[in-house]
Amino acid sequence: MSLLWGFLILILVLIFLGIFFSFVPLGLWISALAAGVSIKITDLIGMRLRRVPPGVIINSLIKAHKAGLSEVTLDKLEAHYLAGGNVDKVVNALIAAQRAGIPLTFEKAAAIDLAGRDVLEAVQMSVNPKVIETPVVAAVAKDGIELKAKARVTVRANIERLVGGAGEATIIARVGEGIVTTIGSAESYKEVLENPDSISKTVLAKGLDAGTAFEIVSIDIADVDVGNNVGARLKMDQAEADMRIAQAQAESRRALAIAREQEMKALTQEMRARLIEAEKEVPLAVAEALRSGKIGVLDYYTLKNIMADTAMREAISKLGQKEEEGRKD
């Protein structure tokens, strides 16, 4: 009977040890003690219950302790992990900042990390500035010649403005705007080609890094190419547009003239019809005048002679006009 009880106690002890070691990473606890980091068994059990991987927290804490970062504590690391942060990257950033002499607190690094920024890359950029290449920017000088410029912007991360500061896209856009303004204010494209550093000096003096997460160290013009003669092309387009407008106006006047001509022809036909209609009334009027005695027979024949004389003169005039036209031909 005592043997059975002893066997049951052994099984219970083994079960307890299995559960205990599943909650407590003994090797990790020993590593922490060997590194001089005081960790309680209850802290490890609490991390297991809160579903926080002890390896990530303890290894980061050991790393911070060895680097002399006394402000980094177990509670801060665990809280940052539970907030969704990258504990290992924050500790590495703090170590890099300490070695480079950059003032950076754990709270600031954690805030940068939670804001979605790569805090370790930011610290590295503070030490080793990054070069950003802008796309080709096209602008037109006052003489109408297009220039295409490409710049290299050297920037250093500004730790204080990483949270809430604008990113690389803003720097590229502002530099492009400055290039366009500088080229556009040049009297001739030759001025820019002869002195391309005037672009970088003008753009750098504008303080384009205001409100961004970076500090502009330098702006260098990598390449300047001559593009199209935009001024000449615009003048050609304007001349072509003016010509089309003039053609349209001339066509409109021609159409009005044709319409007026047709209108006058119709009016002439109408007047001719009225004349013919009036001429038909002349013999009737003459006959009525003869019957009523208003004119005599001699008057009638005198009128006939005048009409015949007029017709003869018109015929002679038309014949003379035809002969004159024949001589000219």
UniProtKB/Swiss-Prot annotation:
It is found in: Cell membrane; Membrane raft. The chain crosses the membrane at residues 4-24. InterPro entries: FloA. It comes from the Bacteria. Pfam families: FloA. GO terms for cellular component: membrane raft; plasma membrane. The keyword Transmembrane helix applies. Its main location: membrane. Keywords: Cell membrane, Membrane, Transmembrane, Transmembrane helix. It is a single-pass membrane protein. Found in functional membrane microdomains (FMM) that may be equivalent to eukaryotic membrane rafts. FMMs are highly dynamic and increase in number as cells age. Flotillins are thought to be important factors in membrane fluidity. Homooligomerizes. Belongs to the flotillin-like FloA family. HAMAP family: FloA (MF_01562). NCBIfam families: PRK13665.1 (NF010186). This is Flotillin-like protein FloA. It comes from Dictyoglomus thermophilum (strain ATCC 35947 / DSM 3960 / H-6-12). The lineage of its organism: Bacteria, Pseudomonadati, Dictyoglomota, Dictyoglomia, Dictyoglomales.
